[in-house]
């Protein structure tokens, strides 16, 4: 049986901020198996974001084996972010 997906503590704030800016945001963290945390729609484009918590030590912010494997196999873009600001930079 698969363990429940862990959601980074900063995810709720990022989701709220993006929604307030007019983005559609769907958490897909519960899919697990390395799938990114958020699917974001903004100005007719989709973005996949893996969220890492900047409050954790750097060794705890690296991609897991599953996350890395998923990203290497994915034929689209996916970005790792730690803040709303980084998400907005990626969507600019």
Regions found by a protein language model. Give the residues of each.
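Catalytic phosphate/metal-binding cores of nucleic-acid and nucleotide-processing enzymes, i.e., regions
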Residues: 1-92
């Amino acid at each position: 049986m698969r363990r429940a997906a862990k959601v980074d503590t900063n995810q709720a704030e990022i989701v709220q901020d993006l929604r307030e800016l007019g983005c559609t945001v769907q958490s897909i963290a519960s899919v697990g198996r390395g799938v990114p945390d958020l699917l974001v729609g903004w100005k007719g484009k989709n973005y996949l974001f893996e969220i890492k918590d900047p409050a954790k030590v750097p060794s705890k912010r690296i991609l897991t084996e599953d996350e890395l494997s998923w990203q290497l196999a994915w034929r689209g873009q996916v970005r790792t972010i730690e803040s709303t600001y980084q998400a907005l930079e990626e969507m600019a």
